[in-house]
Amino acid sequence: VDDQKQQARSDAEEGTVRLFITSKSNNKEYVEKRVAEMMVQDTGDIGWNDEEDYKSLILEHHMAASRFGFSELYMPLSNSKKFDTSLREGSIPELSILSKLVFPLLVAYQSGNDFEVAKIIRKNSPLLNKEVFITGLNNQVELLRKAEEAVELLMKLWNDGKVPTCLEVLKSIRDTGLFKVGNRVDEVLADYSQDENEKITALRTALSAPFYELERYALYVSDNTRFATHQGVKGLEFPRVMVILDDAQARGFLFSYEKLFGVKAQSDTDEKNAHDGKDTSITRTARLFYVACTRAKKSLAIVAYTENEEMVRDTALANGWFLENEIYIV
């Protein structure tokens, strides 16, 4: 892609690479599942059957949110532009309380692990704060009862197969004092006000999402899903990699796979920058494409969503990036 030839190690295992080209309007979940199935057929590697055994590289975090099912939580915070770093890192306080305290408590409670429930409460609940507990020597039974009652009230939100919103969970722990939630939670839980801070509005909208979206978001930001960004895996390698090229969903302007594959023409800015020897969206995209594709140790599937499948195919062949038998139109 960048006119540099890469020399494989003499002892390297021969890998498999495939380019799957599909219309940008196709169902992405279906396409990517079908691609994984086709990789099993072409490689004989059943690791492609298990979503946990291959890495899917996407351009932007919101593409993972839509695929992994936490868009309702993620998009209001992303669109507000007020939480960029903390959203990526998983360090927004209201979300951290839910992911680091409530989620482990829920797992322990629902699995009947009373020891772990007690451990989480003793370590994190102000109701059983060491200082409070010691000064309340004559009232320790009451403190324990209050903590147990707070846990039961929280867990009732999941009774009868119900799924509470993140707001409902926050309200419960604030009202009972089970965990310390911070002053901003009061504003988030209050009714909307026209003169309120934009952050509060975005948080309230995001936290109206069902709690399972918080669980999925927490898994994603802790790198416990198959998704990662093209930029975020530099220097890392994985046995099986699916690189997803989807300009329409990415919404950015710095990179363009449609330009790289000849579907869209260069912009005037691209042409001027190329003439001046500066970076263009094509050179930036070529470098990013190289980084993403070289993350695979055994097999690589590239899924290109496009408005012109034939052009992508012809460009890939004309440039010698892929052989004819390595390309599928899905």
Describe the role of every protein-language-model region:
Residues 1-330:
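The feature marks helicase ATPase cores and/or their adjacent C-terminal helical subdomains
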